[in-house]
Structure formats: C-alpha cells, structure tokens
Swiss-Prot record:
Interacts with TNPO1 and ZNF148. PROSITE patterns: RRM (PS50102). Residues 14-36 have a biased composition (Low complexity). Acts as a transcriptional regulator. Promotes transcription repression. Promotes transcription activation in differentiated myotubes. Binds to double- and single-stranded DNA sequences. Binds to the transcription suppressor CATR sequence of the COX5B promoter. Binds with high affinity to RNA molecules that contain AU-rich elements (AREs) found within the 3'-UTR of many proto-oncogenes and cytokine mRNAs. Binds both to nuclear and cytoplasmic poly(A) mRNAs. Binds to poly(G) and poly(A), but not to poly(U) or poly(C) RNA homopolymers. Binds to the 5'-ACUAGC-3' RNA consensus sequence. There is a cross-link at residue 112 (Glycyl lysine isopeptide (Lys-Gly) (interchain with G-Cter in SUMO2)). The modification N6-methyllysine is found at residue 64. The modification N6-acetyllysine is found at residue 119. This is Heterogeneous nuclear ribonucleoprotein D-like. The lineage of its organism: Eukaryota, Metazoa, Chordata, Craniata, Vertebrata. GO terms for molecular function: DNA binding; RNA binding.
Length: 322
C-alpha cells in the first residue's frame, strides 16, 4: 500500500447531496468559543485589503485589549492579535490589527510617534505576499485513526464543498495515521473552520491549521529563527536591567514585516491561519507540505490532547516524520 491514501471526491452540483444524506442541507456545526483563541479570526492570516496593520515594537506587557483600546481612537477595530511564543506563551513583540475602514490606517500613519505601555511602537501598513492564493487546504491533527472517512466527509462537508480528502497511511504498519488533509473548492469553508482552533470530530478533539506549501514553511522557519535569536538577547537584557528593558526581543519583527504577512501562519494559525499562525512549524514534513510543532509527537508537544498511555495504543503518540 502506498504511503498516502488519496480519496478524490467528484465535484457535485450540490455539496449537500454529495456529502450528506438526502434532505435539507445541514448547517455548519456550532462552534463554542475556544479559550485558545481570543478573537474569532486572526487578521494576520488574510491578504491585506488596505485596512490591516502590522504593529511592531510592542512591550511584553501589552495585551490585545491594550492594543485594541489604543488604536480604537483612530477608528473601529474589527480584530487584533499579538503573536506569542508557542513554548513560553510570552509576547513576541508584534501583532496585527484589522480596522473596519482603510481610512483608519491612514490616520494612524499620520501620527509620527505612537507610545504604548511606555514604549514607542511601530505601526505599518501590512504587506501581502505577491501572488498568494487564498487557502483552500487544511491540516487536521489529533484525528483518531478509528474515525471513518464517512464521518470526516460528513463533518467537514457541512462547512462547504470538498474537492479532496487525503488520509495518510503509516508505511510500516499500513494503518491510518492520526491526521488528514481536506481540500475545499474555495476558501470560505476554511475561514469558517478556523473560527475555532479545536473541533470535536468522532471520538476526539482535533486541531485545524491551514496546509502550508513547503517553501512557505521553510521561509517561516528562517524568519522564526531570527525572531527567537533576538528573543534570547531580549531575555538576557531583561534579567540585567529589569522587566521591559529587553529591547533586542523586538528586533526579529522587522524580518517578518519585510517578508510580508500573507502566508504567515500558520498556521491562520500557525500558529496558522488559529487558529493562529504564530506557531512554529518544526519537526514534521509531509510530502510538499510542512507542518509544525506537535505533529512529531502530539502527546508530548500538545498537552491539550493528553498524555499517551503507558500501555501503548494511543493514536496521539504516533506522529512521526516519513
């Protein structure tokens, strides 16, 4: 049996008929607010439309609420996020803000200096990577191998028309692995899915991330190494001069800004497309796609899913690279 089992689904005239029993189309599953996502959509995950900003130079102590309150004086803030280190949970010193109107961005830029929590911050108009296509493919982690393909079709089909489902197989055991890939015919179902980072599918809780091409994954790794290197200097400075003085922590955000933000996240989410894009995509490669922290060993890296049982058999401890 090949390493990856692909199940290509025909493109139906009506996704409700192709993926669900006959009758009225089911509504998308209701999504309870997740404690892991402070805002419904991560503004860093969508291409810029003129009303999105990158905010660099943030203090470690600045929260989403602080940033939102400050920028609300320039116009209505629809959404905001501050990127955090996936290991420590500490702010990485930059974030993104989405205004309702593009005119608000102009107002922010008209002011030469912006100071928040005792620090000069660096707001810029967000850049989008050229030629970026809207995300249509998602990675589903933490999926029980016992979940049937029909269950997967039923759940994800409720969000929109599915083009393809990929169910990777373990090349040694010929058994299903604990994750899959879903490709939709357009990007709208992906946006709906990412309104919640975690979804109850079958018998377990699964994490949803946007599938990133390997070249994007590698670019993210290079960017994140720069950010983490600066972070180390920042933490050292903080110990020597007191909290909030580690200026080097923020040096890494310039690299992120210069590279553009259309493909960051992660992750949406990553860390992302929260799902948040701010999660490191390290340790796992699947074909031409790169995936991140937690997929080499879900039980060890993602405590949300629980520890693997000592007796073995827990599907969450078998995410090893090909």
């Amino acid at each position: 049996m090949t390493g990856t089992a692909r199940s290509a689904l025909p493109l139906p005239q009506s996704p409700a008929r192709a993926l669900r029993p006959s009758g009225a189309a089911r509504a998308a599953p209701s999504l309870s607010p997740s404690r892991f996502s402070a805002c419904p959509l991560d503004p860093s995950s969508f291409p810029t439309s003129g009303n999105k900003m990158f905010i660099g130079g943030l203090s470690w102590d600045t929260s989403k609420k602080d940033l939102t309150e400050y920028l609300s004086r320039f116009g209505e803030v629809v959404d905001c996020t501050i990127k955090t280190d996936p290991v420590t949970g500490r702010s990485r010193g930059f974030g993104f803000v989405l205004f309702k109107d593009a005119a608000s961005v102009d107002k922010v830029l008209e002011l030469k200096e912006h100071k928040l929590d005792g620090k000069l911050i660096d707001p810029k108009r967000a850049k989008a990577l050229k030629g970026k296509e809207p995300p249509k493919k998602v990675f589903v982690g933490g999926l029980s191998p016992d979940t049937s393909e029909e269950q997967i079709k039923e759940y994800f089909g409720a969000f929109g028309e599915i083009e393809n489902i990929e169910l990777p197989m373990d090349t040694k055991t010929n058994e299903r692995r604990g994750f899959c890939f879903i490709t939709y015919t357009d990007e709208e179902p992906v946006k709906k899915l990412l309104e919640s980072r975690y979804h109850q599918i079958g018998s377990g809780k699964c994490e949803i991330k946007v599938a990133q091409p390997k070249e994007v994954y590698r670019q993210q790794q290079q960017q994140q190494k720069g950010g983490r290197g600066a972070a180390a200097g920042g933490r050292g400075g903080a110990r020597g001069r007191g909290r909030g003085q580690g200026q080097n922590w923020n040096q890494g955000f310039n690299n992120y800004y210069d590279q553009g933000y259309g493909n960051y996240n992660s992750a949406y989410g990553d860390e992302s497309y929260s799902g948040y894009g701010g999660y490191d995509y390290t340790g796992y490669n699947y074909g031409s796609y790169g995936y991140g922290q937690g997929y080499t060993d879900y039980s060890g890296q993602q405590s949300t899913y629980g520890k693997a049982s000592r007796g073995g058999g827990n599907h969450q401890n078998n995410y090893q690279p090909y």
